[in-house]
C-alpha cells in the first residue's frame, strides 16, 4: 500500500473505507455517492478524516488525492472491508475514538459530537451508530437490553419515522412497500439513561467506538464482503 499520514496520530478520527472498481453498470453513479458521503462526514465532524481505499479506479483515487485530501489516505489493493477495518483500528492507541463507516452513508450536521456524548455518557459502550433502522433490533441487542432492564428506562414503540425507513429501504435497494410491511409488526427499543435517550442498536455499517474496545473483534479475513453481523454480535456478547 501507499498513502499519506500525519506526524502525530489524533485522539479522535472519522474513517471510511472506499471501493469503486469502475464506473460502469452498478457503479455508474457510485462516485457521486462516495463524494456525498465523504463531504457530509467531514462537514458534520470537527475531527481529522482517514480514508482507506480498496483498489478503486483512477477517478476516485485522483479525487481523494487532489481534491478531498483526507488527513490520512491509504491506497491499498482490495483487501476487503473487514481486513481494512482491522488495519485501520490497529493504527491507533486504545483510547482513541474512531468512527468507521461504509462509503454510502449520508451524515447530518453534528453527528460526531452527538455520538460522542452517547459513547461517553453510557457505561461500557461497545458501538454507537448515528443511524437506526428497525430491522437492526433483530440482532446484537441482548446485552444492551439486559443492562437497561436493571439500570435505565426502556421504551418500545414506533419511534423511527416511516420516512426514515423509506430512506433506508431505498438506500439498500429493497422495495419500499415490502420493507415497510416487514417492519410494521416490529418495534423500536429506546433507552433513557442519565438524561440521554438512545436506540438499543448499533451496527457495522457506521459506528464510533474506542479503538481498544473493538480491536479484539476486528479480524483479518480473505473475504471481500459478508459475515459482518458476527462483528456486531461479538461486541454485544462482550457486554
Tell where the protein language model's regions lie, with residue ranges:
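N-proximal low-complexity "stem/linker" segments adjacent to membrane-targeting elements
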Residues: 1-40
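Active-site nucleotide-sugar/metal-binding loop of Leloir-type enzymes
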Residues: 86-97
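C-terminal catalytic/acceptor-binding lobe
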Residues: 1-10, 30, 179-239
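Conserved donor nucleotide-binding strand/loop of the catalytic core
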Residues: 64-79
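A conserved acidic beta->alpha catalytic loop
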Residues: 40, 44, 52-61
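Acidic helix N-cap motif at the loop->helix transition within catalytic regions
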Residues: 25-26, 58-66
Amino acid at each position: 500500500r501507499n498513502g499519506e499520514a500525519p506526524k502525530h496520530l489524533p485522539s479522535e478520527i472519522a474513517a471510511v473505507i472506499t471501493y469503486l472498481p469502475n464506473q460502469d453498470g452498478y457503479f455508474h453513479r457510485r462516485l457521486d455517492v462516495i463524494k456525498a458521503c465523504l463531504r457530509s462526514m467531514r462537514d458534520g465532524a470537527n475531527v481529522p478524516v482517514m480514508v482507506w481505499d480498496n483498489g478503486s479506479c483512477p477517478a476516485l483515487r485522483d479525487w481523494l488525492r487532489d481534491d478531498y485530501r483526507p488527513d490520512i489516505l491509504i491506497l491499498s489493493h482490495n483487501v476487503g472491508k473487514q481486513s481494512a477495518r482491522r488495519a485501520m483500528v490497529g493504527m491507533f492507541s486504545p483510547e482513541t475514538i474512531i468512527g468507521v463507516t461504509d462509503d454510502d452513508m449520508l451524515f447530518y450536521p453534528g453527528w460526531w459530537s452527538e455520538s460522542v456524548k452517547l459513547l461517553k455518557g453510557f457505561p461500557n459502550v461497545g458501538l454507537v451508530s448515528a443511524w437506526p433502522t428497525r430491522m437492526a433490533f433483530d440482532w446484537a441487542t441482548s446485552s444492551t437490553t439486559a443492562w437497561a432492564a436493571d439500570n435505565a428506562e426502556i421504551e418500545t414503540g414506533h419511534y423511527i419515522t416511516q420516512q426514515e425507513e423509506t430512506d433506508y429501504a431505498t438506500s439498500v435497494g429493497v422495495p419500499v412497500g415490502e420493507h415497510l410491511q416487514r417492519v410494521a409488526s416490529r418495534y423500536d427499543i429506546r433507552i433513557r439513561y442519565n438524561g440521554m435517550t438512545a436506540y438499543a442498536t448499533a451496527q457495522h455499517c457506521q459506528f464510533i467506538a474506542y479503538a481498544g474496545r473493538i480491536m479484539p473483534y476486528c479480524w483479518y479475513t480473505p473475504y471481500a464482503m459478508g459475515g459482518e453481523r458476527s462483528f456486531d454480535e461479538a461486541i454485544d456478547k462482550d457486554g
